[in-house]
């Protein structure tokens, strides 16, 4: 018994040394087993499932569905620009009576402070002069009597459009209306032209002196015959459309001060087409031309028809105020860069038709959500309850299909 106990104690005291054989590893190119797992990065899920920022979503709302979010002022354009900006959103609502036996042209051009330009001509005639209708906030944002007072060029250095939209909502009696509405887009641009003019001051009376003038190009696209890409429908159906950025990436534009924008090239005996400030510029002047398309509405009213409608226009503009401007105190830091919002914008702008009827306007944001779903694969990119509900299950899109 004693010997057994001693043997057990001796065994317990023995130090057991074990050696582990090293197994040679094959080169990476010759391995056949599963690849070793890499450590998961903390932000890997965010990279795989990017989400729109709040500023990016506000930008898309203002760009494509301004009527659905009229009280949302927007937060600017979430691109690579960094600085102080002032974002404003204008809305104009007016009742329009269309003259029988005429073609009425409503031109919504990216001129800061102006809701639209209007011209009335005989049926089939070529319009030449379009008189502007300013927004009610023109005096607040750009100064009243800007021809002789403080113009916009003294308050802001540059501007750019985030969005511009227009809707025609007929209010005619169903038994009295007649006619049609056509909608299309044109590209207008300002160019510099060096023109000779006779001056009575310098260098001497009667001597020609060159000066640089701003002229407009593209007005010939506003004509009686609509281009191939257009929306055509009955007047009673109305129409809604929006403009989109036609520059590289929301380029900043300079402010100017002009009483009119006239064509630079007039062919043959044609009359020069022009955009005019109302009242000869005593209260307002044309402030510039922005970076988005121009919207053209042509309403044809036959003899005996009684056509009336509500015309609404919206725009979202981003401004760079001068530090000595009274509006500088209302400016804020530009929104952070959101590449997903910009990618969605450039994909969305080419997927929608030129225009839709006014009754389809009420569900336009739902159409934007459907296209977002096609682009991103899931609506979970949208922050807030919408993204939470739709993550992984696509239920929201199914509700709107």
UniProtKB/Swiss-Prot annotation:
State where Ca(2+) 1 binds: 272
Positions annotated to bind Ca(2+) 3: 272
Keyword flag ATP-binding: no
Matching entries from InterPro entries are given as: Peptidase_A6, Viral_coat
Q: Per the UniProt entry, what are the Gene Ontology biological process annotations, in alphabetical order?
A: proteolysis; symbiont entry into host cell via permeabilization of host membrane
Name the residues annotated as catalytic in the UniProt entry.
68
Binding positions for Ca(2+) 2? 249, 251
Annotated stretches, region: Disordered = 1-43
Q: Where is the composition biased (Basic residues)?
A: 1-16
- Gene3D superfamilies documented for this protein: 2.60.120.20
> Site annotated as Cleavage: where?
361-362
Q: Does the keyword Transferase apply?
A: no
Instruction: Please give the positions of the paired cysteines in each disulfide bond.
Output: 62-316
Query: What keywords tag this UniProt record?
Result: Aspartyl protease, Calcium, Capsid protein, Disulfide bond, Hydrolase, Metal-binding, Protease, T=3 icosahedral capsid protein, Viral penetration into host cytoplasm, Viral penetration via permeabilization of host membrane, Virion, Virus entry into host cell
A GO molecular-function annotation = metal ion binding
Enzyme nomenclature, EC number: 3.4.23.44
Q: Name one GO cellular component term.
A: T=3 icosahedral viral capsid
Q: Which family does it belong to?
A: Belongs to the peptidase A6 family.
Q: What is this protein called?
A: Capsid protein alpha
């Amino acid at each position: 018994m004693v010997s057994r106990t001693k043997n057990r104690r001796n065994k317990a005291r023995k130090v057991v040394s074990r050696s582990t054989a090293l197994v040679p590893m094959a080169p990476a190119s010759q391995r056949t087993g599963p690849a070793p797992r890499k450590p998961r990065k903390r932000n890997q899920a965010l990279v795989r499932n990017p989400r729109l920022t709040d500023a990016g979503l506000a930008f898309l709302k203002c760009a494509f569905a301004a009527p659905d979010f009229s009280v949302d002022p927007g937060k600017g354009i979430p691109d690579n620009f960094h600085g102080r900006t002032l974002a404003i959103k204008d809305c104009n609502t007016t009742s329009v009576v269309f003259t029988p036996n005429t073609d009425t042209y409503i031109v919504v051009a990216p001129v800061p402070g102006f809701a639209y330009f209007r011209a009335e001509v005989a049926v089939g005639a070529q319009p030449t002069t379009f008189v502007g209708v300013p927004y009610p906030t023109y005096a607040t944002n750009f100064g009243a009597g800007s021809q002789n007072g403080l113009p916009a060029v003294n308050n802001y250095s540059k501007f750019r459009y985030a969005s511009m939209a227009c809707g025609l909502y007929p209010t005619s009696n169903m038994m009295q209306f007649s006619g049609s509405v056509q909608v299309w887009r044109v590209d207008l641009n300002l160019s510099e032209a060096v023109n000779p003019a006779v001056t009575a001051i310098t260098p001497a009376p009667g001597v020609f002196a060159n000066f640089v003038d701003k002229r407009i190009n593209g007005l010939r696209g506003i004509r009686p015959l609509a281009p191939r890409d257009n929306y055509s429908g009955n007047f009673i159906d109305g129409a809604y459309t929006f403009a989109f950025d036609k520059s590289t990436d929301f380029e900043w534009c300079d402010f100017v001060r002009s009483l009119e924008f006239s064509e630079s090239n007039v062919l043959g005996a044609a009359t020069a087409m022009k955009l005019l400030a109302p009242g000869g510029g005593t209260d307002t002047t044309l402030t510039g031309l922005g970076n988005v398309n121009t919207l053209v509405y042509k309403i044809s009213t036959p003899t005996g028809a009684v056509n009336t409608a509500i015309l609404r226009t919206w725009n979202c503009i981003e401004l760079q105020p001068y530090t000595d401007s009274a509006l500088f105190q209302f400016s804020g830091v530009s929104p952070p860069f959101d590449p997903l919002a910009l990618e969605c914008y450039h994909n969305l702008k080419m997927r929608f038709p030129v225009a839709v009827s006014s009754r389809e306007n009420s569900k336009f944001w739902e159409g934007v959500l459907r296209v977002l779903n096609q682009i991103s694969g899931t609506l979970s990119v949208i922050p807030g309850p919408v993204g939470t509900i739709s993550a992984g299950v696509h239920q929201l899109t199914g509700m709107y299909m």
